[in-house]
Amino acid sequence: MTSDTIRQTLDELLLDKNGGSSNEARAFFLSQIIDQLKLISSQTDAERQLQKLQLKDPNDNIVKATPPPPPPPPPLISILQQAPPPPPPPPPPTLKAPPPPPILGLKTPSKSLKTPTPRPKECPTSFLPKKEKKTKTRTVQWSKINASVVQDDSVWGKLAKASNVDIDFDLLDNFFGIESLAVSGAAEVVKKSTRKDAHVELLTAKRSQNVAIMLKQFKNIDELIDDVSQNKPVAEIDALQNLFGMLPQSEEEEALRRYTGDISLLSPPSSFFYRLVQIQFYRLRIETQIFLSDFSRLMRELAPNVEILIRTSQEILTSPTLPRLLLIFVNMGNYLNGNNSQGNAFGFTLNSLWKLIDLKGNKQEFSLLHLLVTCEPDLVAHLQEELSTLKDASQISFDEIKISLKTLRDGRCKLEKQLETCSGASFTQFLELIKIDCKFELDEFGANYDKLTELQYQLADYFCENRNTFQLDECLKIFNFLMNRLQQTLKEHVTRETRKLKKEEKKETQTTRECEKTMKKPEKIDLFDALTASNGGPESPRKRAAGILDMRQKLGNVRIRKLRDVTTLESSFTPPPPPPLESPTDSTSSKENESVKPAKTSTNYEMCNDLESYITSLTRKRASHLPKAPPKEEPKLPEVLPEKSKIALKIEKIPEKIDKPPLPQAAPIIPKLPQKSIKAPSTVTTRSKVPPPTAAAAVRIVSVTTTTTPTKTAELRKPGARSPKTTVATVPKVTVVPVSRVPVAPSTPLSRRMSAPVVRKPTMTAEKKREITMKPSVSTSARPSLINTSSHPMVRSPLPKMSVLEKPKPLRITRPTVIPQSPTVTSSARPSGLRQPAKPKWV
């Protein structure tokens, strides 16, 4: 029984006189269901049709009919039994639940109506608000009653006829509002408030998610659909390749084509595929655009690579230096393999170059390439010039070119056949590009490829390799590696030779310097011979002494004026005449000094000094304007004292023993001598009280110190220099003490003294000494009493530091006091002018 027969039979049964309007409603619903049966081919279609026929409230809840469904009428069953039972239509394979239950559910509400009042189709005006909603508010969770259930005698039927109600909707917005909404119709407001995501999904969840991620790669989906439909090139070619791998499958494509609902209800992935499926031959259009894009890109890459390989192969075949290199390798290998079966070789394979390159000698840093570079240093430069494109060609894969060419040829032929089968003017442009342009470029590229293949065979024959196993890529990589190692070895060789030359030059330079030093080294001359030889020559003062000469002369002039004053005072004594002033250096005359000239100073003589030479010349100039002393003989020791005593003839004779009355002045200054060695002073004087001179002898008395040694002038020093300590005290009376031979301490030579001024230390006053807290100079561990525990500053103790086991030593030994003796003591007598030291003070 067909669907039309079933509809006609149902119409006859339902449109009877007893059924009334309820039967008409049943017939209407049944006709809709029968019409939809043609569109149901899968479970998804059945579920979709079921959702359309179900009655739902605003919250998507199914409205169940209150009265139970009545049993079917018996006349319908009897008629169906009398009719011959037709074969039942085959159910859909994927349909699990048949649609009759919802059909019966839809019948029950119409049968449960007791009154024949017509069902209101629209909501009564009394129930609708008088103001459009502009604010998003909270929703009311209730169960909505359908208009078909409402009866006239019910409360909702009576309220539908009631008058309008005045409600303050602004107050509702204030209390229940969330956010404002765009002004739209009442139907849209109800639709938005019922459900947020009311999308129909024709794909699985995972499939829909992957498609949504892929669509984000396109800037504009609508523009993409237009470009595909009009055969325009797509800018996002990479995204188009991803899209080609995710196109709808056959089942998905069939479901998309059967969809007749609203497109706006579909999800974005389903909507995109739905629009794409509507384009005729959409898959072929996308595939053609991808092929054309890949074809142009591969041609731009492969064509230059093939040309480089052709050029490099020709350079290897025509290079004259490469056979020379192989000849050197063969000779070296046959020499090294002369005692085994590997010798006397006619050649070697290209793979053997890997082992020849890494062949090391008895030293790890020396290889076979080092020897080759040493023998033929220009070989590397010639090879680099002849094989200029070898480095670029070694990075190209010949197998990839072969595979790409085969792929392009197969793809072009396949698309050409597909486009020819598709009728229509829309594919004319694609067909011309594939059939004419692409074929021409492939033919030209194939000719170059065939030429490269022929060169590969020539190289195999050139190096005596097998054509079937010879690979152009491997050959180019071997020669490129050989070139790199040769360049590296050449750099090492040049660096080694440069270092060797620098080392030899440095050695020659050192040898030359040593020879020059030996030639310039003067002979060692005796100092006495040098001084004797330089007596008659002119003086050669140094530049350093010339600067000091002016200051020394100024200082010398001041000191000389003082000496002249002294000589004038000494000359005032009438009896006897004063002794003549002697020269500062020696008692000899100036003529004798002029005759003897000092030796010139030089760095070769260790005992010579520039300052000594300068002082000698300075004293010679001073002695030139002084009165010359008559030559005198050296006085004998016993006669020295009587001659010196003639100086004080006019002075009263000094008694041998002098009574020293107590002096109000301070004690005499006694110089301290170092302990353990007492040396006799060069000048011995005594301080004595002399009565005031008379009027007759009212002359100025100049103190003259008499010694057995020749007199010397004062040393010349710079202003501010510290004068040496002297023990000579000037007194109104000269006391001459006859002293036996006393060893005179020689004065420090001028050559050992510093010419720089002595820096004076600031003197410490007594008040400053009191303020400074001094540490005890004695060990406080041995003497606890010395520890200062008071707040008063401690005075520096004169006691020396002592250890616990050390024996006490005398703190000070008194200086020997000189006792005047009579001048009649002979030189052979024992010196008795020294008083024994007093007892030492013990700790």
Swiss-Prot record:
Entries under Pfam families matching the protein: FH2
Signal peptide: none
Keyword field: Actin-binding, Cytoplasm, Cytoskeleton, Microtubule
Result when mutating I213A: Loss of actin binding and organization
Disruption phenotype annotation: Defective cytoskeleton organization characterized by disrupted F-actin and microtubule dynamics leading to abnormal excretory cell tubulogenesis. Specifically, F-actin structure and organization in excretory cell canals throughout life is disrupted and microtubule organizing centers accumulate at the tips of excretory cell canals, with a strong reduction along the canals, and the direction of microtubule growth is altered.
Subcellular location: Cytoplasm, Cytoskeleton
Polar residues composition bias: residue spans: 776-792, 819-830
Coiled coil regions, renumbered to chain: none
Tissues where the protein occurs: Expressed in the excretory cell and mostly accumulates at the tip of the excretory cell canals.
Gene Ontology cellular component list: actin filament; cytoplasm; filamentous actin; microtubule
UniProt main location, coarse: cytoplasm
Cited InterPro entries: FH2_Formin, FH2_Formin_sf
GO biological process: actin filament polymerization; epithelial cell development; epithelial tube morphogenesis; positive regulation of actin filament binding; regulation of microtubule polymerization; regulation of tube size
UniProt-annotated stretches for the region Disordered: 54-135, 568-601, 748-767, 773-843
GO terms of molecular function: actin binding
Impact noted for substituting K360A: Loss of actin binding and organization
Xref: SMART domains: FH2 (SM00498)
Residue ranges annotated for the FH2 domain, each copy included: 127-512
Pro residues bias: start-end ranges: 66-76, 83-103
Chain's role: Constitutively active protein required for microtubule and F-actin growth, structural maintenance and organization during excretory cell tubulogenesis.
Entry similarity comment: Belongs to the formin homology family.
Protein name in the entry: Excretory canal abnormal protein 6
